[in-house]
């Protein structure tokens, strides 16, 4: 742990070193690397603080800037890892967790996830410290990506022609990685929630403990290696890995996340240049693989660890503007049944749900297909979605859909 001495003057050294060890232990525990710790092979992680560089991770060490926290290079990370300093600001916990996550994310990472799959570790570090809440976009945002118009996982934030809805060819380069509001071509705030949902269901509420560890362990075997030169194939391989680790058919979950929408070949710039393609045949093979598992996963694409509260800023513990009125993890944990009739009204494109607190989500179904989902009692469906003739269903924690009264 290499620091400028100014960072240690106020609190001393011991607590900062202990916290650094905590961060390493927690992340290696999550990634199932802790079982190899006695070899020393995975114990060489270092931290460096400089006054000139921003935060980054490379070659088994991470860097945090020691500059003014109000400037780009000092953003949120001027601390000595002493909890009395570090825990005053969630960024001070999140940043090291994020950069260390780059060291540990290999088994769950492919181009389009590099700046989001590591945030599973960021959120885990924050959870273990226990003062702040998790980050990431809302389920309403996911619905917009999924249905307005239907967009594949790898292209959630990519620009489209407003008339044809065709994707505009990206002209991003390695020197222009934040164009279109993207970072390295990905919707990191949204993408990070996928793994957070898996962790929340399998680990936090204990439905299938050690599933996340199995995902990492399997991801380090030839059967589930993610091909670095074929991100489309890696995307679907990851879905298979999760299904095998959970011993569940994960079709519904990954469908909600846009994994099963074909992707016409495009060039993705994400720490390199990659051709990203997902064909219908690749999708069909993955769907066939899912059928091997007789148990269907509950609708955990709706699970949340944040309750909705308007105006809740700063990733507060358990509440967020990005949270939901329904779908909180306790509903899944207790396998709550819907015992009250759920009703709704529609005004234009605004839906208002009454007596729906026992549900985990609400779905609009048209011609037998889901065309929208929400986890709020009041939600607006975009013009891009044809709601004529659609009916609203309340989703129970076990996956049963119950038609609501209009």
Predicted features and spans:
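Catalytic cores of extracellular degradative/oxidative enzymes
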Residues: 2-200, 215
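Residue-identity detector for glutamine
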Residues: 3-5, 28, 88-90, 105, ...
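Ser/Thr/Asn(+Pro)-rich, low-complexity disordered segments
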Residues: 4-62, 218, 230, 245, ...
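Phenylalanine-focused residue identity feature
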Residues: 8, 42, 51, 77, ...
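Glutamate identity and glutamate-enriched acidic tracts
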Residues: 18, 27-29, 41, 93, ...
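A sequence-composition feature that detects small, non-aromatic residues
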Residues: 31-32, 44, 54-58, 65-74, ...
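Long, well-structured alpha-helical subdomains associated
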Residues: 132-251, 256, 260-274, 278, ...
